[in-house]
C-alpha cells in the first residue's frame, strides 16, 4: 500500500494533474511541504491524547506528507525500508539517546 501511494505521488510530480493537492505541494516547494509535515506531526501528538480514530486519521495524513517529502527530495521509499531493515534486531538503550527536556 505505501509503495503504491509513493509511486502515485512520484507520478504526480512527473506528470502534474491540474487541481491535485499533491501537485499544489510540489508547486509550492520544499518549505510548504516541510510546514505541512510539521503541522501533521503536531496533530498526531494531539490526536494521541484523544480517540483512536482521530489518531489513525492524523497518522495517515502525516504518512502521506512524509511520502511527498521523500519524493520532493528524490529519496526512494526503498531507502527508508533498507534503513529500517538495517536497524532490525539492533539493541538500543536509553543511554544511546539524547535526553528530551521540558516536555
Swiss-Prot record:
Q: What is its main location?
A: cytoplasm
Q: Which HAMAP family match?
A: HisE (MF_01020)
Checking SUPFAM superfamilies in the record gives: all-alpha NTP pyrophosphatases
Task: State the compartments where it is located.
Answer: Cytoplasm
The record's catalysed reaction(s) read: 1-(5-phospho-beta-D-ribosyl)-ATP + H2O = 1-(5-phospho-beta-D-ribosyl)-5'-AMP + diphosphate + H(+)
* Pathways involved: Amino-acid biosynthesis; L-histidine biosynthesis; L-histidine from 5-phospho-alpha-D-ribose 1-diphosphate: step 2/9
Enzyme Commission number:
3.6.1.31
Give the record's GO CC terms. cytoplasm
The keyword Nuclease appears for this protein = no
Q: Name one GO biological process term.
A: L-histidine biosynthetic process
Query: In which domain of life is the source organism classified?
Result: Bacteria
Fetch the Pfam families from UniProt: PRA-PH
Keyword Cytoplasm appears in the UniProt entry: yes
Q: Name one GO molecular function term.
A: phosphoribosyl-ATP diphosphatase activity
Q: Per UniProt, which keywords does this protein have? A: Amino-acid biosynthesis, ATP-binding, Cytoplasm, Histidine biosynthesis, Hydrolase, Nucleotide-binding
What is this protein called in UniProt? Phosphoribosyl-ATP pyrophosphatase
Under InterPro entries, the record lists:
HisE, PRib-ATP_PPHydrolase-like
Q: Which family does it belong to?
A: Belongs to the PRA-PH family.
Amino acid at each position: 500500500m505505501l509503495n503504491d501511494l509513493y509511486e502515485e505521488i512520484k507520478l504526480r510530480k512527473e506528470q502534474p494533474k491540474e487541481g491535485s493537492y499533491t501537485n499544489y505541494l510540489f508547486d509550492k516547494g520544499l518549505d510548504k511541504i516541510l510546514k505541512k509535515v510539521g503541522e501533521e506531526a503536531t496533530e498526531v501528538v494531539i490526536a494521541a491524547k484523544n480517540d483512536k480514530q482521530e489518531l489513525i486519521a492524523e497518522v495517515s495524513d502525516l504518512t502521506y506528507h512524509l511520502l511527498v517529502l521523500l519524493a520532493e527530495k528524490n529519496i526512494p521509499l526503498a531507502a527508508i525500508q533498507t534503513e529500517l531493515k538495517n536497524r532490525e534486531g539492533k539493541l538500543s538503550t536509553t543511554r544511546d539517546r539524547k535526553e528530551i527536556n521540558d516536555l
